[in-house]
Amino acid sequence: MNRNILEEMLQYLLIDWIVGDQFEIQLNQQLWSLIPNNDVRRLVSHVIRTLKTDCTETHLQLACAKLISRTGLLMKLLSEQQELRTVSMTAWKPRMNRKSRSRMRS
């Protein structure tokens, strides 16, 4: 193989890897509020990055469609779980009764 072609291929792969890493880092930051668990968030970011790069190949499109669907379901479940946590935390905040508030004012 011609050395120049090999160098160009390696350079392309390196640029693709760097851009992919930047994409994954940004995605990880955006998912932070939705997925507080770092390991799960990194997994989801990596899956999305993989889908973005590998699903353009024709022979992988059916498998990718299934993975995209299941990833969407996972994101929906995680979102619902986060909403329940938020509601639960709000409901359990201690509330001061009227007597306590009136004592604090005096």
Swiss-Prot record:
The highest taxon in the source lineage is Eukaryota
Among Pfam families, the record links this protein to: LRRC37AB_C
**What InterPro entries does the annotation carry?**
LRRC37, LRRC37AB_C
Q: Which PANTHER family match?
A: LEUCINE RICH REPEAT CONTAINING 37A-RELATED, LEUCINE-RICH REPEAT-CONTAINING PROTEIN 37A
List the protein's name.
Putative protein LRRC37A5P
What organism is recorded for this protein?
Answer: Homo sapiens
- Taxonomic lineage: Eukaryota, Metazoa, Chordata, Craniata, Vertebrata
